[in-house]
Swiss-Prot record:
Cellular compartment(s): Cytoplasm
Organism whose genome encodes this protein: Salmonella schwarzengrund (strain CVM19633)
InterPro entries associated with the record: Amidohydro-rel (IPR006680), HutI (IPR005920), Metal-dep_hydrolase_composite (IPR011059), Metal_Hydrolase (IPR032466)
CC cofactor note: Binds 1 zinc or iron ion per subunit.
Functional summary from the UniProt entry: Catalyzes the hydrolytic cleavage of the carbon-nitrogen bond in imidazolone-5-propanoate to yield N-formimidoyl-L-glutamate. It is the third step in the universal histidine degradation pathway.
Alphabetized NCBIfam families for the sequence: hutI
Pfam families referenced in this protein's UniProt entry, alphabetically: Amidohydro_1
NAD is among the record's keywords: no
Record EC number: 3.5.2.7
Protein name: Imidazolonepropionase
Pathway this chain belongs to: Amino-acid degradation; L-histidine degradation into L-glutamate; N-formimidoyl-L-glutamate from L-histidine: step 3/3
Residues that bind Fe(3+): 74, 76, 244, 319
Alphabetical list of SUPFAM superfamilies matching this protein: Composite domain of metallo-dependent hydrolases (SSF51338), Metallo-dependent hydrolases (SSF51556)
Residues the record lists as binding 4-imidazolone-5-propanoate: 83, 146, 179, 247, 324
Amino acid sequence: MRQLLPGDTVWRNIRLATMDPQRQAPYGLVDNQALIVRGGHICDIVPETQLPVSGDNIHDMQGRLVTPGLIDCHTHLVFAGNRAAEWEQRLNGASYQHISAQGGGINATVSATRACAEETLYLLARERMMRLASEGVTLLEIKSGYGLELATEEKLLRVAAKLAAENAIDISPTLLAAHATPAEYRDDPDGYITLVCETMIPQLWQKGLFDAVDLFCESVGFNVAQSERVLQTAKALGIPVKGHVEQLSLLGGAQLVSRYQGLSADHIEYLDEAGVAAMRDGGTVGVLLPGAFYFLRETQRPPVELLRRYQVPVAVASDFNPGTSPFCSLHLAMNMACVQFGLTPEEAWAGVTRHAARALGRQATHGQIRAGYRADFVVWDAEQPVEIVYEPGRNPLYQRVYRGKIS
């Protein structure tokens, strides 16, 4: 009989999808198990028969499914306003250029966000965060990028920090100052990149406001040379990097990010075999964002088969943002990744657990249920993990556990 220490908490009588690749069963499944939690971490996984029949802090889950807490590794959660009218214009035939000339596009969100009070931004972001948490998300990446000036980029990162401090969720904040060229630098994008590299990155890093630097390397974003300046600046300061790359065209952004051992290359619809090989060599995770693919009615799919062949880890994320992926649902992203991109349900689950953790540099502590990892997990009214992927809109979450506490 397993002896429990005072303060231990146990979840017993569970079907456990560990997502541990060392377990041979699909999803790392093991039946009739119990989880022992101590000090906010998983202490042990033991067979049900090794536990006392009852006791304090022992929760009987009556055979329910338990998985790691979900991880959304790519979001733009903090912004003001929406772009619904712009979307309607596009569907009525207006071009992106026409909408931009009217003040639409990303700079519309930038203007609204700059004008928005910090507390209002917090309340807007918290409501979105709670929607994700209600689906079982326990770790969430949040990018800046709707400030495009020092003061507002800092404001967005402070909101992310407050979300982490005041709610039962982990936040991984990312500086995405190199998201777009702001209106005041329209004719001088190189000058804006200088501002990013010489002012924003070092000053905001010194304040401890972010974990990684991101950029948008694309024909409608920044070119390879401009992107490399951002990567060089970050790496010189010891900051992990990642990139929005190969979404609308093939510029070689994935190879560039991988040369700097990037945490992830995101979107990657136009990724080629050389880029896939570079990602393998750089230890870079591929992050699929099917919401943007769907919303923009794109047709070029990511090279999933090449990613499998080169054994590049693949994550899946919501990319929640007002312009190209207004879907605040990781369950929906999992379903879309299967239906649109051809992932298996097990690959989609890996994409929101252990591979998403790797995309955030948290693979040693998050994304699996195993001894020593954080006690962030979800209890579902379901028998199989595929049920959560299969039916978006139905949420069978029974219990969300964060740092060993029911939340």
